[in-house]
Amino acid sequence: MITRARAWFAARTTAATDWPVEKLLIRKTSRSARISVVIPARNEEATIGAIVRRIRADLIDATGLVDELLVIDSDSTDATAQVARRNGAQVWAAADIRPEFGAYHGKGEAVWKSLFVATGDILVFLDGDLTEWGSHFVTGLVGPLLSDERVQLVKGFYDRQFAGDNGDAAEARPQGGRVTELVARPLLNLKWPELAAVVQPIGGEWGVRRELLESLSIPVGYGLEMAVLLDTWQHYGLDALAQVDLGIRRHRHQSVHDLGVMAAEIQHVALLRLHADPAAHAVLNQFDRAVEGGWVARPVPVQERPPVTSVSERYAERARIARARAPRIRTSGR
């Protein structure tokens, strides 16, 4: 690892326990900051309720650190939206937000659309499939943003649960997922070595300043986190990044074929930022004996949404007015 990356790791890595909520409340008040937690979700009815309840109880009702909690539903076919709303989240269907801009399917699309309805100066994003986690995920991600104005993006990292050698004993290891270790981390070490010390470069738990995210183009799918990391580094440098150890995280796992599509999206994002020609249409062909002919063509979302600040001058003014008028806590939504 290059010296610059090692020095960044030593200077910009903290633990969630370094950021007690009492300290954060003082800093939030002194900066007149507003904090939104946003959960992009699709078919997460089994987990979304518990996530929403914990954030509301610990960080809205008990402390007031978080001002609003939004679930952006991305074409769920289950009861994700109803469960989230019933447990106290403001719920929006991604396709219903600014419909004049059309709609894509994907996590990045939900995040891009969230910028039109969230009102926070600081945005914290969590995945909707978490099963082992805590509200310290939010406080940890907020901490560096409230304490250092140079920090623009905070990445969470954690130990993941893996099966033990006997196949049934769970153990925690400080590793990324399969796509992280086989795709994202090798890419960063080979082409962006200053970012080699980012432990979870494509993890779904991160905090960001609103002004930064509004200025970036957003891939509509799973290339989101890689693009935000690379573009933040490109525009603001390594010192604009920080990371926080969140402890242990457990979530629902995807099939290898689904991860293949994710890997293709991340590689496309990286190639674009290496100035390769963009793919107008991308397809991943995967072999599957269960289907006739053996091959399945999976579309790979490669579109990117433009920076929110570029789509409408009028939007920027409306958003500023909306944030100024917004109530401190919202308990209902669409």
Per-region residue spans from a language model:
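Terminal low-complexity segments of carbohydrate-biosynthetic enzymes
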Residues: 1-9, 254-334
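Conserved catalytic loops of nucleotide-sugar-dependent glycosyltransferases that act on lipid-linked
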Residues: 173-273
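A conserved acidic beta->alpha catalytic loop
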Residues: 73-81
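The conserved acidic donor/metal-binding loop of glycosyltransferases
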Residues: 127-133
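Conserved donor nucleotide-binding strand/loop of the catalytic core
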Residues: 67, 81-109
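Acceptor/aglycone-binding surface of glycosyltransferases and processive sugar-polymer synthases
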Residues: 99-107, 111, 133-212
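Short aromatic/hydrophobic "clamp" motif used to bind/position activated sugar donors
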Residues: 123
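N-proximal low-complexity "stem/linker" segments adjacent to membrane-targeting elements
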Residues: 1-57
